[in-house]
Amino acid sequence: MPAMNLKYKFGLVNSAGRYLTAEKFGGKVNASGATLKARQVWILEQEESSTISYLKAPSGNFLSADKNGNVYCSVEDRTEDADTGFEIELQPDGKWALKNVSHQRYLACNGEELICSESSTSNPSANWTVQLAIHPQVCMKNVQHQRYAHLKTSEEGEDSVVVDELVPWGADSTLTLVYLGKGKYGLEAFNGKFVQTDGQLAGTANEQTQFTLIFTSGHLVLRDNNGRHLGVDSGTRVLKSSKPGLTKANYFILEDSCPQGAFEFGGKYASLKQGEDVSFKLLVDEDIEDTETFQLEFVETDKYAIRVCDPKKNSRDAKFWKTVAAGIQANGNSKDQTDCQFSVEYNGNDMHVRAPGGKYVSVRDNGHLFLQDSPKDFIFRLLNRPKLVLKCPHGFVGMKEGKAEVACNRSNFDVFTVTYKEGGYTIQDSCGKYWSCDDSSRIVLGEAAGTFFFEFHELSKFAIRAESNGMLIKGEQSGLFTANGSEVSKDTLWEF
């Protein structure tokens, strides 16, 4: 199964605190952005085994510089214009200097105007701070070991991030890249602690948890303040800074973290404890294990393949729900198989699952699944987002400055705690305040906890429906975050 590798999206901030900005028309580019919004987001493209990088604007055009130092963003095909190639030179403080390959000059600023005529990096305006613009919650795979990082507790009770999972399964496999300022990032584990250079976990960020991001041949490298690189200990597989030098053990790939959860119906969870037959056997007051956890892998809008976990976690070969004459079995070999693709529909907090032939998945009295004409009300309980970060085209979701309201145009994200409650979820900020709807349907923070439902529709995007009025939360460019959306659209979908 091909991995869902993430594109590296970022903003570039100059010495005056302004972002590299691509205007919508005329191929114009400048350094006028005060915050990281859509026009300030660039995609990094690199070729395998090449040091040349290309910066792609939201319009799809590429950044370029001519021999006179003029900077444009009008080239549609980078292969037809050598002026689009840049070399990224990492500075001692972690900032980037961007040297145009054709003319050997550095990208800099004169006020808001961009110029590419500097012959050295001594001018502060030729140094750029990098701020990631991808969703920060990811799965992280090591290139050399072809294993995923996850939080693990040793027999002695010590927590560490270990790179030994063939398949990222469970909340412990989701890591968060936290921006710490001045171009530095921290790697936060599921328990809220940060990875240190020595492999131990720290409760708060410090100098030993700061890393500079380096992109090479499409891979990510994290360099610590001592010039060493985060890697995998050959014996313990613990994530820690390695010896000097750079090898494939220091190369990582960031992948999308798909939603994983349990299907609930009639006081029981769907389970694979019976083998390949999917059946509702486990009572809801029992512990949910890997055999009750299923992953929604996006196929197209409102359609998913439902992946199951290999109980032994010793195989990369994916298995999926598959329709058979007797019902549903977990022996599908590919998400591309038509009989492994299920449509999802929503009714309040209930999910209806429609099989490829148009019939709905239902449950017999003995707990086994079969297909029928009418829908059955399931609840999909999301398990691998106990900590939630939300992103939309206008920015990240977080507390509005100076007010007990939630806004959706923040440059930096807030982390919210999600608690499952009777088919819905409560959402709490870092200060212990809960989301709820006020009389104007705005999402506010307070002591009273509102209930919300998640509806999965797109790749790593869901809609959030408020129980209080039955409406979807809608975001606006101004940051307004209100439960007044009546239909699923780009304004009511949230990247999670």
Swiss-Prot record:
Keywords tagged on the record: Actin-binding, Cytoplasm, Cytoskeleton
Molecular function via GO: actin binding; actin filament binding; protein-macromolecule adaptor activity
Keyword set includes Transferase: no
Region forming the signal peptide: none
Superkingdom of origin organism: Eukaryota
One GO BP annotation of this record: actin filament bundle assembly
Subcellular location: Cytoplasm, Cytoskeleton
Primary location group: cytoplasm
Alphabetical list of InterPro entries matching this protein: Actin-crosslinking, Fascin, Fascin-like_dom, Fascin_metazoans
Residues passing through the membrane, by range: none
Gene Ontology cellular component terms for the protein in this record: actin cytoskeleton; cytoplasm
Record bears the keyword Cytoplasm: yes
Family: Belongs to the fascin family.
Described function: Acts as an actin bundling protein.
Protein name (Swiss-Prot/TrEMBL): Fascin
Organism encoding this protein: Strongylocentrotus purpuratus
